[in-house]
C-alpha cells in the first residue's frame, strides 16, 4: 500500500513497504529514494576511560612496545597493544596476582601472587608459555612491590618488614640487601648498570634523606642532608647523575 503521498507541484513522494519513492506524473516513472544519514559516530570514537574501578591494578609495557602485562581482578593478562590475542597467564581464581612487570629483555613477566597463603614472586616465560613458576618460598610478610634489574638477571622487592630483597629468579634464591626496622624504604630503584640502588628513608628528625647503595660492597652512602626533605631519586639513563626532589624553600 502507498502511504503519506506529498507533492511539491512537480513530483510526488510517498512511502511504500517502509521505503520512500518519488513519482514523476509526467512520465509516470517511480524511483526509490536512497537515503544516507550522516552521523557523528559517537559510539565509534576513541575514548579515555578510567578502568580503576573495574579491577585493573597495574600494567607494564613490553620492551618492544607491542604488548602489555596487565593485572586485573587478581589475574595477569598478556595483552596486545593493537590487534592480537589476549592471554590469561595465571588462571587462578583462588588467589590474587598483582604488580606484573615485564623484564627489560622482553623474555619474562614477573608478578606477585598469594596462592600459597603468603605473597611470593612468580615468573612467566613469555616464549615458552605454560604455567608461571614460583621463584620464592616461605616468605614471612607482605611484599609491597617488585621490579626487574635493568640487566634482567634479578628481581627486587620491598616488604612490610622494611626490607629490600633481591631475588635470583632463575636460581630461585634471594638475599636481604638492606633492612630499616624503624622506617619504610621508599622510591627504590636500580642504576642502569644494575650495580647500585637508590632510595629514600626518613631521618630521626622525620626529614627524608636520599641514599645510594653499592650492591657489590654492601655499602650505603647518603646523598642529601637531613636538614632538607628529599625524595623520589632516579638515575639518569647513562647512570652518571642522580635526580631527586628536595624541599629547600624556607618561609
Where are these regions (language model features)?
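A flexible loop/linker signature enriched in serine peptidases of the S9 family
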Residues: 1-3, 13-25, 36-44, 52-53, ...
Amino acid at each position: 500500500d502507498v502511504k503519506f503521498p506529498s507533492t511539491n507541484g512537480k513530483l510526488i513522494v510517498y512511502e511504500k513497504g517502509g521505503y520512500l519513492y518519488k513519482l514523476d506524473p509526467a512520465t509516470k516513472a517511480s524511483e526509490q529514494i536512497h537515503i544516507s544519514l550522516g552521523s557523528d559516530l559517537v559510539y565509534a570514537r576513541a575514548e579515555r576511560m578510567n578502568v580503576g574501578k573495574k579491577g585493573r591494578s597495574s600494567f607494564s609495557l613490553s620492551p618492544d612496545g607491542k604488548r602489555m602485562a596487565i593485572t586485573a581482578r587478581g589475574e595477569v593478562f598478556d595483552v596486545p597493544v593493537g590487534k592480537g590475542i589476549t592471554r590469561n597467564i595465571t588462571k587462578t581464581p583462588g588467589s590474587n596476582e598483582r604488580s606484573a612487570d615485564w623484564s627489560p629483555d622482553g623474555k619474562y613477566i614477573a608478578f606477585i601472587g598469594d596462592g600459597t597463603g603468603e605473597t611470593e614472586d612468580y615468573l612467566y616465560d613469555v616464549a615458552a608459555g605454560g604455567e608461571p613458576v614460583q621463584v620464592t618460598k616461605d616468605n614471612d610478610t607482605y611484599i609491597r612491590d617488585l621490579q626487574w634489574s635493568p640487566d634482567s638477571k634479578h628481581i627486587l622487592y620491598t616488604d612490610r618488614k622494611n626490607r629490600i630483597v633481591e631475588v635470583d629468579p632463575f636460581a630461585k634464591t634471594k638475599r636481604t640487601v638492606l633492612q630499616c626496622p624503624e622506617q619504610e624504604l621508599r622510591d627504590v630503584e636500580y642504576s642502569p648498570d644494575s650495580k647500585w640502588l637508590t632510595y629514600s628513608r626518613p631521618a630521626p628528625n622525620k626529614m627524608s634523606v636520599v641514599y645510594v647503595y653499592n650492591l657489590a660492597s654492601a655499602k650505603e652512602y647518603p646523598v642529601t642532608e637531613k636538614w632538607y626533605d628529599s625524595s623520589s631519586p632516579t638515575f639518569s639513563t647513562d647512570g652518571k647523575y642522580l635526580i631527586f626532589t628536595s624541599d629547600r624553600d624556607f618561609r
